[in-house]
């Protein structure tokens, strides 16, 4: 990295921090602020989905590092539907095709997520290893599938390697008027879908029997099995749901008419959203509701970080600050865990000491005999009167 002609003084540091914390509001004119706000919300949508995907798996005691592959599978399934059915000029039919595309993408992601879940449940293979393998398998499937469909590749000037967008086929994500509220941005109804799904997952985890079983399995798999719960079923279903959520994130992102997918027939990269969902889930303590706000916060900082470059700062500063926030959040959780363990240990020691003292008291009472009862002295009886006290 080159730091030539970049701001390096302390005053510049505070200036850069103000730009970063200003987020979309540090972009200057009101029109740019509105556009940046809309884009911030749009780019937070897939991050919410991958974050909730990681969170629900973690609740079941699993680490879903395969969200990137599930994201790609959801994108692939949805684009195969949306780009092969042309509904231009028929918006009503276009909405139906869009719904179908999202559902197909979700099913693809669920099936892909079930693979590491199945190996974990049946063969006790660590899901991290299987997820890493399925990530790259998914990337190769993308290259293979779209390589068989050259008619989906954009042949326009300067667009080499990109797929056509849903703007060509008329099956883009509905905007529901949000594009008028945030003019010039990519925002669409995907954010509403993401929020509804995140809230639904939270309700499912906290208010339903199935959610309780997932959390019980995550707390103690074998204890849940002893209690009569199907640990294997819960593990497979948890990873299937996680895969479906990450896949919907990929579908919502690439079904937007303004987003192009960079297709590489030789080496398909893994999307950053699949991995960025991990810190989003960790910062939100794996709470689906909290993940919504964390994703928006991360995108808020990224938007501010994008304005740093034009002000003469290094563009990676925002990533460094977000990484520091994640580390401090992790340390705070570690500190809380340590303190809770100390309190639990102290409570056990206190209870043990009280129990020992009570047992000693019982032993003392059983060893020391009871004192004999005192005999009452009776007054002498007079021989003459037969009355007590007369002599």
Cite the ranges covered by each PLM segment.
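Cytosolic-side transmembrane-helix boundaries in multi-pass membrane proteins
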Residues: 1, 219, 226, 230-233, ...
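Membrane-interfacial amphipathic/re-entrant helices at transmembrane-helix boundaries
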Residues: 1-49, 95-96
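Transmembrane helix-bundle core of multi-pass membrane transporters
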Residues: 19, 135-207
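Single transmembrane alpha-helix segments in multi-pass membrane proteins
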Residues: 25-85, 102, 106, 110-125, ...
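Hydrophobic alpha-helical segments embedded in the membrane of multi-pass proteins
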Residues: 44-55, 72, 76, 110-114, ...
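Helix-loop-helix "hairpin" substructures at the membrane interface of multi-pass membrane proteins
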Residues: 70, 182-261, 288-289
């Amino acid at each position: 990295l080159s730091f030539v002609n970049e701001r390096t003084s302390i005053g510049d540091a505070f200036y850069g921090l103000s730009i970063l914390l200003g987020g979309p509001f540090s972009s200057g004119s009101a029109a740019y602020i509105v556009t940046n706000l809309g884009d911030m919300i749009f780019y937070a949508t897939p991050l919410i989905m991958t974050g909730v995907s990681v969170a629900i798996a973690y609740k079941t005691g699993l680490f879903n590092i395969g969200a990137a592959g599930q994201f790609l599978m959801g994108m692939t399934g949805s684009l195969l539907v949306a780009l092969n059915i042309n509904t231009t000029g028929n918006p009503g039919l276009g909405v139906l095709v869009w719904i179908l595309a999202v559902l197909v993408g979700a099913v693809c992601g669920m099936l892909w997520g079930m693979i590491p879940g199945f190996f974990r449940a049946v063969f006790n293979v660590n899901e991290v290893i299987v997820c890493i393998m399925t990530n790259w398998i998914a990337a190769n499937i993308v290259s293979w599938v779209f390589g068989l469909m050259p008619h989906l590749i954009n042949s326009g000037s300067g667009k080499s390697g990109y797929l056509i967008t849903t703007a060509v086929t008329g099956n883009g994500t509905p905007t529901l008027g949000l594009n008028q509220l945030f003019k010039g941005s990519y925002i669409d109804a995907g954010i509403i879908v993401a929020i509804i799904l995140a809230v639904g997952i939270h309700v499912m985890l906290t208010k339903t029997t199935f959610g309780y079983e997932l959390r019980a399995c995550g707390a103690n798999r074998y204890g849940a099995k002893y209690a009569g719960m199907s640990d294997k079923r819960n593990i497979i279903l948890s990873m299937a749901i996680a895969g479906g959520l990450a896949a919907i994130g990929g579908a919502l992102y690439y079904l937007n008419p303004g987003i192009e997918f960079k297709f590489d027939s030789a080496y398909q990269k893994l999307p950053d959203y699949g991995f960025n969902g991990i810190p989003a889930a960790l910062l939100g303590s794996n709470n689906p509701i909290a993940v919504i706000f964390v994703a928006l916060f991360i995108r808020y900082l990224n938007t501010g970080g994008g304005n740093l470059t034009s002000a003469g700062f290094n563009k990676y500063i925002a990533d460094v600050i977000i990484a520091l926030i994640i580390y401090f959040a992790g340390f705070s959780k570690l500190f809380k865990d340590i303190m809770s363990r100390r309190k639990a240990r102290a409570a056990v020691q206190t209870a043990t000491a009280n129990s020992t003292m009570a047992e000693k008291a019982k032993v003392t009472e059983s060893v020391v005999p009871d004192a004999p009862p005192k005999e009452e002295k009776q007054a002498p009886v007079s021989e003459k009167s037969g009355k007590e006290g007369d002599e």
